[in-house]
Design a protein with these regions (language model features):
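Short aromatic-centered micro-motifs
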Residues: 102
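His/Asp/Glu-enriched, well-ordered alpha-helical/loop segment
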Residues: 1-89
């Protein structure tokens, strides 16, 4: 519990001080497929707006990794992998966890649920 409280405090400090935040991990200890929950945590724990959490997972992540010339936004000439969710994540950020399909390289992959 102390570690979770420390993480919450760190996120709030970073948000309050306008530190650029990228959503995601390359840590082997975090189960793959749960990253969408980070959008929710950034809003609930960090006080981000839903849009700020989405930016953290898209354009901020690309920029902070040095890949923003190729990805991170829906811009002509950039690579685009797109996720679709059933509702507006700006109204309910938990919609980011309800992916209905992913489009990668122009091919649509639908979820089974």
């Amino acid at each position: 519990l102390a570690a979770a409280a420390a993480v919450r405090h760190a996120i709030k400090l970073a948000v309050a001080n306008q530190v650029p935040i990228a959503l995601g991990t390359d840590a082997g200890v975090v189960p793959h497929g749960t990253n969408a929950h980070e959008f929710v945590l950034m809003v609930q724990w960090g006080g981000m707006t839903p849009m700020d959490s989405i930016v953290a997972g898209t354009s901020n992540a690309a920029r902070l990794l040095g890949w923003d010339k190729n990805l991170g936004s829906l811009t002509t000439g950039k690579w685009a992998d797109i996720v679709a969710v059933p509702g507006n994540p700006l109204q309910d950020i938990e919609n980011m966890q309800k992916v209905t399909f992913v489009m990668k390289n122009g091919v649509v992959y639908r979820t089974s649920n």
